[in-house]
Amino acid sequence: MASSPLLPFLPLLLLLLLEVPAAAPASPLQSLLQGAAPCKAGEPCLQRPVGKSDPPPVNVNLYYESLCNGCRYFLVRELFPTWLMVWEILNVTLVPYGNAQERNVSGRWEFTCQHGEQECKMNKVEACLLDKLEKNMAFLTIVCIEELDDMEKNLEPCLQIYAPKVSPDSIMECAMGDRGMQLLHINAQLTDALKPPHEYVPWVVVNGKPMTEKDQLLRLVCQLYEGEKPDVCQILASSHKEVCFK
């Protein structure tokens, strides 16, 4: 996958999110800072500031497979930017499995993945990241890995950025062991239980309904959220297409 100009700035973005001065104008960044305030110094903490009467966030579930170029594009170029802009009204769930198949062989699950054994391995790696890391840090680490061409090789540098206390060896041990097998089996069950069944990947379910090819994720999230909209949603609502009549 071609390198994005956005990803190298991820560490800087996080620093900005965590270090915006208290006197800065209200914005999604300021909201994130307020949510991070109770965290210990030096530890990333991206927690949604929740009011007593706040409506629930919009749920976005992504069913995908790690080596699918379309999945990688959606994750890095659409889901991640949307998360950056409206993280406070968004609840993202990643389910790495996709179009894989499983079978029970003598009490152990074996998997066949659309893009070969390496995809099965990386599906397990990402499932283990989701299992072992705080949710937001797992999401950011997976975005980092999916952006880069050699995902397995870049597990270590991505962890160093977003979860420096977690060793790559512990993630690989999880992925190659019984826990990785169990996690991928759970993802298989979640994927197989989809109603309607998924037709392709990436398969995106927003508040329980499949997203159509015509939908734009950020606009859809803004439309579905029932509370006070973030500033970016207000901008979207006031925008319109310009046309030139003949």
Swiss-Prot record:
Glycans are attached at N91, N104. Residues 1-26 form the signal peptide. Its EC number is 1.8.-.-. Induction: By LPS in spleen and blood. It comes from the Eukaryota. Residues 27-53, 229-246 form a propeptide. Keywords: Disulfide bond, Glycoprotein, Immunity, Lysosome, Oxidoreductase, Redox-active center, Secreted, Signal. One of its GO terms (cellular component) is extracellular region. InterPro entries: Interferon-induced_GILT. Coiled coil: none annotated. GO terms for molecular function: oxidoreductase activity, acting on a sulfur group of donors; oxidoreductase activity, acting on a sulfur group of donors, disulfide as acceptor. Disulfide bonds join C68-C71. N-glycosylated. Sugar chains contain mannose-6-phosphate. GO terms for biological process: antigen processing and presentation of exogenous peptide antigen via MHC class I; antigen processing and presentation of exogenous peptide antigen via MHC class II; negative regulation of fibroblast proliferation; protein stabilization. Expressed in many tissues, including spleen, liver, lung, heart, intestine, blood and kidney. It is an enzyme of class 1 (oxidoreductase). It is found in: Secreted; Lysosome. Belongs to the GILT family. Dimer; disulfide-linked. Both precursor form and mature form have thiol reductase activity. Lysosomal thiol reductase that can reduce protein disulfide bonds. May facilitate the complete unfolding of proteins destined for lysosomal degradation. Plays an important role in antigen processing. Facilitates the generation of MHC class II-restricted epitodes from disulfide bond-containing antigen by the endocytic reduction of disulfide bonds. Also facilitates MHC class I-restricted recognition of exogenous antigens containing disulfide bonds by CD8+ T-cells or crosspresentation. This is Gamma-interferon-inducible-lysosomal thiol reductase. It comes from Sus scrofa.
